[in-house]
UniProtKB/Swiss-Prot annotation:
Gene Ontology terms, MF aspect: DNA binding; DNA-binding transcription factor activity
Native organism: Streptomyces coelicolor
Gene name as annotated: mprR
InterPro entries in the record: LysR_subst-bd, Tscrpt_reg_HTH_LysR, WH-like_DNA-bd_sf, WH_DNA-bd_sf
Function: Transcriptional trans-activator of the gene (mprA) for the small neutral protease.
Name of the protein described by the UniProt record: Small neutral protease regulatory protein
Length: 316
């Protein structure tokens, strides 16, 4: 972890000197550490110059994975501390798990308002499989997960599935100056020459994207990276990426639906049997999702565009 944090700090600050100051170590010590890392890998991770350090191609690949590991470790430490603190507090507890979603924050806020006497903790993981395994031995009380269409999750025996949405379309994120960004709906063929960015650590995402691209008869280059790397590359026009339709607006990125909605996921709340919080959790999850759908302009328009779409989310 120390090596990964050092690499991330150098990339974030743009120089070994500033990274050393941020990490609280001497510049020579950090320089030596970087050299040892590069020697162990057999290649340089950064270009050094008068203007600072820039990641090499290999460096960008390593950093895309390193950030995920560092962020996951930070979440793990925070959750472990919260768990340790909670063990010393009496009263009801609710251990919530979730894959990455724009609605999790609002969902937790609503849950805490609904159950003010309950100590609610959150575990976030990119892998739905990990969360489902935590539910099976009752390490989690419930988990909100998504299942990529065509890549069914292996739900452990005994768990109860509550479907929030049978088919949520996945939209595409583009740079504002991308030619397809001017259209209300984007065809896959319009993205055949773009680099596609996917997160291989998300269960089923790469397989789902690969199937859809193959069915469309296109074979664009594919990059693997985490959310932060994806967002920066999309904003710079270096890639396009599938995204949740509830994604909020950004000045440096536009969100558009794909024609005929070829990419989709199923949204599930999974609980052990006889979970007393299942009903309230599902109701507040539905409310949080509907609120997010209303805030996301392209998704709201998509929901209003055809009668067979889940208009109940909009109160219809």
């Amino acid at each position: 972890m120390r090596h990964l944090r050092a690499l991330c700090a150098i990339a974030d600050t743009g120089s070994v000197r500033r990274a050393a100051r941020e990490l609280g170590v001497s510049q020579p010590a950090l320089t030596t550490q970087l050299r040892r890392i590069e020697q162990s890998l057999g290649a340089e991770l950064f270009h050094r110059g008068r203007d600072g350090c820039r990641p090499t191609l290999l460096g960008r690949t390593v950093l895309s994975r390193a950030r995920t590991v560092v962020d996951s470790m930070a979440v793990l430490v925070e959750e472990a501390r919260a768990e340790a603190a909670a063990l010393g507090r009496p009263g009801p507890r609710l251990r919530v798990g979730s894959t990455a979603s724009r609605i999790v924050g609002d969902w937790l806020r609503r849950l805490r308002g609904r159950m003010p006497e309950t100590d609610i903790t959150l575990q976030v993981d990119v892998s739905a499989t990990v969360l489902l395994r935590c539910c099976a031995p009752a390490a989690l009380d419930l988990a909100f997960v998504h299942e990529v269409e065509g890549s069914p999750l292996r739900v452990p025996d005994g768990l109860v599935q509550h479907t929030l949405l049978e088919r949520e379309p996945q939209f595409i994120s583009l740079a504002p100056d991308h030619p397809a960004a001017a259209r209300p709906v984007v065809d896959l063929a319009d993205l055949a020459q773009d680099r596609w960015m996917v997160d291989p650590s998300v269960d089923g995402e790469w397989d789902g994207v690969r199937r859809v691209l193959a069915a469309a008869g296109i074979d664009p280059p594919v990059l693997h990276g985490d959310y932060l790397t994806t967002a920066s590359l999309v904003a710079l026009g270096e890639a396009v990426a599938p995204c949740q339709p509830t994604s909020g607006p950004r000045d440096d990125m536009v969100i558009r639906p794909l024609r005929d909605d070829p990419l989709a996921v199923r949204l599930l709340l999974v609980t052990p049997p006889r979970c007393p919080a299942a009903g309230p959790a599902y109701e507040e999850l539905t409310a949080a999702y509907a609120a997010a759908a209303l805030r996301a302009g392209p998704y709201r328009e998509w929901l209003e565009g055809a009668p067979e779409r889940p208009g109940a989310l909009l109160g219809g």
